[in-house]
Amino acid sequence: LNDVEIEDGTVRIIYDENGAERRFEKINANLSLPHLVDPLTAKGDFDWKNTRVGFDLKLSTPADLESRSARIELALDTEAIDAKFDGNVMSKPAFSVEGDLTAKSQSVPSLIAWMRKEPPTEAAVGSGELSSHIAWQPGEITFTQARFALTHASGQGQAVVTLKSPRPHLRAA
């Protein structure tokens, strides 16, 4: 797969036997993976929740995912947020990610509305930035060395988000 071009593609991820799914549509991308032991690079854009998302991905060696972690660099660019992640990803024994995240949004309320599928809201929060070391394991995301800045507030600390239904639980200090 030296040079692959995807035009107007769709990816459906089906989560369970009930057919719960997530769709990524209108995918336009260029990717390269000469061999499974070579780096995977992919760059392009797609639609998610009616918003164009640009991406740039580098994965050190996909073959490593069979038995150990692989290095990953991912940048996402939307109207709602610009984010970069640099770290490691594992697929076994369970999916996990650990590394450094930086993100910047011109409108935190619009970002939250986009993530939750709700119409944009007006609020005084305004823009925001976040940087943190994160560890994402099944059922939990841990933020350490976290720093955030909003229009009228800033802070630092750590947090753990427990991903349980019906709502996630946040503990922070």
Regions found by a protein language model. Name each.
Residues 1-97:
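Elongated, acidic membrane-bridging lipid-handling scaffolds
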Residues 29, 116-120:
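Extracellular loop and loop/strand-boundary signature of outer-membrane beta-barrel proteins
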Residues 42-44, 57, 85, 99-101, ...:
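Membrane-embedded beta-strands that build the outer-membrane beta-barrel scaffold
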Residues 74, 119-121, 133, 145:
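Beta-strand-rich interaction surfaces with strong enrichment in secreted/lumenal proteins
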